[in-house]
Amino acid sequence: DGGATLFNHSMESTPYMDLDSKYTNLIFTTTFNRKFSNRFTNKTGFTYTNMFYKMDLSIAPYEAEPLEIVSQGKGNTSLISAYNSSSVGLTERWTLNAGIYGQLLTLNNKWSVEPRVGLKWQATPKTTFALAYGMYSRMEKMDVYFVKTKSTGNQSVNKDLDFTKAQHIMLSFGYKISDRMNLKIEPYIQFLHDVPVMADSSYSVLNRSDFYVEDALVNKGRGRNVGIDITFERFLEKGLYYMISGSWFDS
């Protein structure tokens, strides 16, 4: 929630903008873990999220004029997701992690199935290398689906949008400095597709900065992210624990 006020030459205040925005999520989640052997474990999970959204935005067209509603949105939907992943010790030094993730948006029955796999190599007692690949998807913010404006004829024009999708590739290097200290370096690249964009425009939800989206969008955008995360961790000893991390990111 928020608002803005203007002051005239006599320092009298008049409201310029009023925003009432509410998001509420009800979440149920459960996981089941099973260790079949020292080299084989499995994890299964399920999450149900019921989401509620309400937004009213009013703006004064001119100074000292009464506020007028320019955008409204209200609705609810559910996101259902489930996954199954396994960790298999192929040898003493090689570990395979593989799984599958799926989700369904009940608003428009859009769904996705996403495989994910990773391979880890214990090169030395202190050094590990890993390579991972996965497909990921996400729904947009609730206002994208439910906001109504005068320019759209007070209709929600984006209810049929599909998920934004991405393919992630990540490398990982881990070094055990001592029994209490660990260093991890993780470079990655992400290729995004099916990004909601405005047709015949440079607008993309990847760089949105507005309170709401008022135009029809299509899943035809692309993006690319590349970055690196570096983490130094000192484990708990004598009541002291700390972590130092840094990131570089380009989109």
Regions found by a protein language model. Name each.
Residues 33-39, 91-95, 122-126, 166, ...:
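Outer-membrane beta-barrel channels and translocator barrels
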Residues 32-34, 88, 102, 111, ...:
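Residue-level signature of outer-membrane beta-barrel architecture
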Residues 24-30, 78-84, 100, 113-117, ...:
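Hydrophobic, lipid-facing positions within transmembrane beta-strands of outer-membrane proteins
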Residues 44, 95-102, 118-122, 171-172, ...:
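Conserved beta-strand->loop/alpha-helix structural units within folded catalytic cores of enzymes
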